[in-house]
Amino acid sequence: MKILRIDSSPLGDASVSRQLTASIVAALRQATPDAEVSVRDLTVAPPDHLTGELMQVVKFRNLEGLTARQQEELALTDALVDEFLAADVVVIGAPMYNFTVPTQLKAWIDRIAQAGRTFRYTETGPVGLAGGKKVYIASTRGGVYSTNAAMSALDHQEAFLRTVLGFLGVTDVTVIRAEGVGMGPDARAKALAAAQQEIDALAVPVAA
């Protein structure tokens, strides 16, 4: 089994989402000791946001007369897509920033959403090509957004990720959430304990 861990928080060791992604991967490895793990830290070498120039290369594949930088960006994009497609399990660290995902994570999504590779257009609509994998989303939030409709309407984080992954054909998605972590030490500890309890269940091997 190949596990791909994606981290997007710039907070380093202070990041709650990184704490959760590390715990999720550890639990999965406990259940499947021979699993191969790759880590993509989107804050160490963040992919550039798409410009008009980059769109022509990495999205529309106009490949004549590429500059050295364009060749590098094309190679990076293809590597990110290959890495995503090769993974059996993807663990995504996704803190909520201003009601949505960090800019680094959005830039990664823009690279892996590739027509002809992770989805394709048909006469009846788009079809995802990246199915057959499991995704865990380590969702962290300073406030609480899951308990009432008014706050849930502000969620452009988990809902966005489920939409994008579904578009790519990935429907086996589990969200492990720690919310309210900015509402004081007690709320933070309670949220982390609840998330860890969910994670601990992943460490139990599945009977053949």
UniProtKB/Swiss-Prot annotation:
It comes from the Bacteria. Its EC number is 1.6.5.-, 1.7.1.17. FMN binds at S9, S15, V16, S17, M96, Y97, N98, F99, T140, R141, G142, G143. Gene3D superfamilies: 3.40.50.360. Binds 1 FMN per subunit. Quinone reductase that provides resistance to thiol-specific stress caused by electrophilic quinones. Also exhibits azoreductase activity. Catalyzes the reductive cleavage of the azo bond in aromatic azo compounds to the corresponding amines. PANTHER family: FMN-DEPENDENT NADH-AZOREDUCTASE 1, FMN-DEPENDENT NADH:QUINONE OXIDOREDUCTASE. This is FMN-dependent NADH:quinone oxidoreductase. It comes from Azospirillum brasilense. The lineage of its organism: Bacteria, Pseudomonadati, Pseudomonadota, Alphaproteobacteria, Rhodospirillales.
